[in-house]
Amino acid sequence: MEGLKVTPLRGVYEEYGGKIVDFAGYELPTQFKGFLHEHHTVREKAGLFDVSHMGEATVKGKDAQKFVQYLMTNDINVLKDNEVLYTFMCNEDGGVIDDLLVYKFAEDEFFLVINASNKDKDVKWILDHKGDFDVEIVDVSDSIAQLAFQGPLAEEILQKIVDVDLQEIKFFKLKRDVLVNGKKCLVSRTGYTGEDGFEIYCKPEDAKGLWHAILNAGKEEGAQPIGLGARDTLRFEASLLLYGNEMDETITPLEVGMGFFVKLKVEEDFIGKDALIKQKAEGVTRKLVGFELLDKGIPRHGYEVIKDGKVIGHVTTGYKSPTLNKAIGLALVEEQYSKIGTEFNIKVRKKELKAVAIDKRFYTKKTKTK
């Protein structure tokens, strides 16, 4: 695939039967043994993902914490060293520039993990807003590879090849300099699947060895490599949002039900705070809802949502859920039609199919929160 970037793991995909696609300008595997098989593997056992296409940046310096707080909607000040926080980075109108993870190493050192499709945009945004803050910002994406190992057996398997007790790494916590198969890595108990699991950051030259070591460690338990197809169905079932689908620069966190990650009472200003305060006071005019298709069909991103002949919104993500075996979706609709139990239609291939609004938390599984 000419002109596309590759990750340090590009050479291993075919060994495992990977089918390669263009994703965010990278050659990445959409599936290995089939996305349904891979989806169930992560729900029931453990699966390994190459997520080295994600972006990473460091923010260091005397004003690092103040600067990161200025960029983010969540309360960075509550973070302790070696903790991770999910947050939004918004524009002045409250629209989402990106959703990302903030890793705190120390008060003067933070590590940001950003979406692959937004890497260049995010780094430019961060640099453009540096102002007089005493910080150094470095895009370190090309010097880091990232693997995600997710599923109920992930801890048990990974424990075989690490030098620390993984139970000490609690949910949304991190540990640096963990030896994974003898290689120094940053390991956090985070993920994008709705299952327990870990994200592992390593040197690019160590990625292939770690990939093979993790899969070999989990051979008896049935660990498998997982492609982008299952990654999307897994995150969707867990109602984890995808940039470009559920959010973009014209959609605010409040509209998609993510107000918990917007701390309007923090003393410090952050970009978009005034707009979000105003929106909260006035009330949102549209909301993200879950829905189940009652007629036979599969909803897809961009399909119209219709009520009494009027377009009231659009589908942001839709699938036949592998876990629930139902055609379900997320849709951004006018606020008055967002109540659970509201009936509307989804336009699927020129036909209007019946649907009903349901709780968008389609699937929940306990992760290790303590």
Curated annotation (Swiss-Prot):
EC number(s) recorded for this UniProt protein: 2.1.2.10
GO cellular component, one term: cytosol
Top-level lineage group: Bacteria
Molecular function per GO: aminomethyltransferase activity; transaminase activity
Biological processes annotated in GO: glycine decarboxylation via glycine cleavage system
UniProt catalytic activity: N(6)-[(R)-S(8)-aminomethyldihydrolipoyl]-L-lysyl-[protein] + (6S)-5,6,7,8-tetrahydrofolate = N(6)-[(R)-dihydrolipoyl]-L-lysyl-[protein] + (6R)-5,10-methylene-5,6,7,8-tetrahydrofolate + NH4(+)
UniProt-listed InterPro entries: GCS_T, GCS_T_bac, GCST_C, GCV_T_N, GcvT/YgfZ/DmdA, GcvT/YgfZ_C, TrmE/GcvT_dom1
UniProt keyword Iron present: no
Keywords annotated in UniProt: Aminotransferase, Transferase
Subunit structure: The glycine cleavage system is composed of four proteins: P, T, L and H.
Family matches, as NCBIfam families: gcvT (TIGR00528), PRK00389.1 (NF001567)
Membership in a protein family: Belongs to the GcvT family.
Job of this protein: The glycine cleavage system catalyzes the degradation of glycine.
UniProt-listed HAMAP family: GcvT (MF_00259)
Protein name: Aminomethyltransferase
Organism: Clostridium botulinum (strain 657 / Type Ba4)
